[in-house]
């Protein structure tokens, strides 16, 4: 659990992987000590196998990737001044079903009516992103916390922020994932945040801490780190009501 008194936290960013918070919600993480970044897939796999992405990023094994990326995340957090929590859950390539029950149990003690909880929409259709979203929905039910859903970067801007959904690759389309949240958010009225220079400077510095990921991300998203590039924008959908008693609409196995 977080090092600081969790009663002082106003914002909890729930990130599927180590770099997703910095990529998508830097405007909130820039608040420093009042924010907490909780990474769901923050654990090492039990075996010594490897994944193609981890190999591309320079890691010889899954455990090496988990250790190295956790260190990168702590370095990024030190720049912004926020605390981090890494749940002991490995990435999707190293497990079978998403552990919804374990994630829900870890989140539950942190959720209060005066806390804003930031969760991924699930754009990109990655099982860890969709599973994280659904676990947040389950954990938040009945707590009264304020839910906000963020556009998952880089999937969300891969074809351009303003692209028509039909022109995006099927997995990166926004509409199917937003449809799962239509009972909570106004799908057609996102909150668009353009980062000021100070926050953009911090965001770039945080992402440079996640150095292992940059080469791989640049293959499909060249120049995404440009000063006036797509990272300058962040997109959110606030829930129109406080977290009600509800069931996730696109659940993952517990």
Locate each region found by the language model.
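Active-site beta-strand->loop->alpha-helix modules in alpha/beta enzyme cores, enriched
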Residues: 1-142
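The feature marks non-catalytic terminal segments
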Residues: 2-3, 69-87, 92-98, 142-254
């Amino acid at each position: 659990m977080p090092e600081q008194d969790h009663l002082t936290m106003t914002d909890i960013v729930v990130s599927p992987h180590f770099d997703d918070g910095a990529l998508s919600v830097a405007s909130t993480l820039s608040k420093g000590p009042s924010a907490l970044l909780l990474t769901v897939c923050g654990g090492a796999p039990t075996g010594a196998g490897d994944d193609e992405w981890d190999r591309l990023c320079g890691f010889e094994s899954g455990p090496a990737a988990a250790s190295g990326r956790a260190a990168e995340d702590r370095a990024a957090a030190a720049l912004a001044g926020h605390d981090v929590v890494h749940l002991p859950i490995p990435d999707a390539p190293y497990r079978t079903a998403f552990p919804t029950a374990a994630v829900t149990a870890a989140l539950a003690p942190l959720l209060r009516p005066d806390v804003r909880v930031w969760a991924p929409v699930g754009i990109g259709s990655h099982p860890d992103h969709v599973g994280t979203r659904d676990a947040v929905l389950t954990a938040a039910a009945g707590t009264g916390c304020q839910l906000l859903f963020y556009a998952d970067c880089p999937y969300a801007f891969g074809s351009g922020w303003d692209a028509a959904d039909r022109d995006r690759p099927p997995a990166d389309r926004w509409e199917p994932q937003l449809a799962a949240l239509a009972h909570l958010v106004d799908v057609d009225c996102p909150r668009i945040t353009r980062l000021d220079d100070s926050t953009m400077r911090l965001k770039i510095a945080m992402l440079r801490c996640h150095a292992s990921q940059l080469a791989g991300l640049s293959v499909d998203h060249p120049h995404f780190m440009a000063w006036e590039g797509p990272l300058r924008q962040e997109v959110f959908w606030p829930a129109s009501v406080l977290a009600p008693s509800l069931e996730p609409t696109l659940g993952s196995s517990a």
